[in-house]
Amino acid sequence: MDTLTHTHWFLLALGALIMGMSKGGIPGAGNLTVAIFALVLEDALGPVGVPMSVGLLLPVLISADVAATGVYRRHADWKYILRLLPCFLLGTVLGWWVFDYFQGGNDRVSQLKTLIGVILLSMTALHFILQARKKKKADELPSAEGSSTQNPPKGSMGLGIVFGSIGGVATMLANAAGPVAQLYLLVMGLPKYVFIGTSAWLFLIVNVCKIPFMIDLGIITWESIVVSGWLFIPAMSGAVLAPMIVKRINQQIFETMIWFFIILAGFRMIF
C-alpha cells in the first residue's frame, strides 16, 4: 500500500464517502465505490489490486453499516432480515470457495459477475412486467386497489432463498450484493425508512461474518486494515449526512432512484 499517491487517497476517500451515503439512504450509490476502489488499487498495485480492493472495502462497509444502523435503528423489519440471512450466509460460503478457486483467474471471475448482472437485470424486467399486470388488474377491479401493498407478495419465502443465495455469492466476490437485496426488499413493498433500516442491519451482520473468509483468502491484511481505518471517517460521515437528503425525497422518487441504480449496477456487472 506504500504505492498509494495523494490522488489515490483522495479517490478512496471519495469512494468511502459515497459508500456511506449509500448505506445512509441513497441506494445504489455504493456500486460506484466498488468500481472506484477496484480501479484505484489496480492502478496502484497492478492486477493484484483488484481482489485486494474487495478486502480493503469490507471494513469501510462495516463502519458505514454501523453508522446507518445507528440512524435507522428503529426501522428494521427483522422478519425480512431473518428470511434473507441464512441463504445470504450460505451464498457467502459458496462465494468464498469460488473466490479462492478463481484467484489468479480474473477472466473467469468476470464471467461469473456477468452472469449475476444478467440475472439481476432479468429479475428487474420481471418485476416491471408483474407491476404492469398488477396495475391492469387494479384498474379492472377498483375495489382491490391498495390491497397488494399490505401483505408480502405470494412466494416471498422462495424469493428470499433465491435472492439471498445470489446476494451471498455477489457480496463475497465483489461486495456487490446491495442491488440484489434492494431488489428483493423493493418487491416486498417496504416503506422508505424500513427499507433502509432493514438493508443496513442485514449487511452489517453479513459483512461482519465475511471477515474470517477474507482473512483466509489473504485479501484482508494488517496493512489493508490500516488503510481502511483512515477511510472510516468519510464513510461514517456519508452515512450520517444521507438522511438529511432522504427526508426531502418522496417515496416515488426514492423507488425510481433505486431502480435506476439497480439497472446501472446490472450493466456494470455485465460490462
Show which residues each predicted segment covers.
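Generic transmembrane alpha-helix signature in multi-pass membrane proteins
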Residues: 34, 66-73, 180-185, 210-220
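Membrane-interface alpha-helices at helix entry/exit sites of multi-pass transporters
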Residues: 45-57, 80, 189-201
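Juxtamembrane transmembrane-helix boundary motif
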Residues: 1-21, 35-50, 71-167, 221-271
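Anionic-ligand binding region
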Residues: 157-172, 178-192
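Transmembrane alpha-helices of multi-pass small-molecule transport proteins
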Residues: 52-71
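Hydrophobic alpha-helical transmembrane segments of multi-pass integral membrane proteins
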Residues: 190, 194-214, 224-226
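Transmembrane helix boundary and interhelical junction motifs in multipass membrane proteins
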Residues: 25-34, 173-182
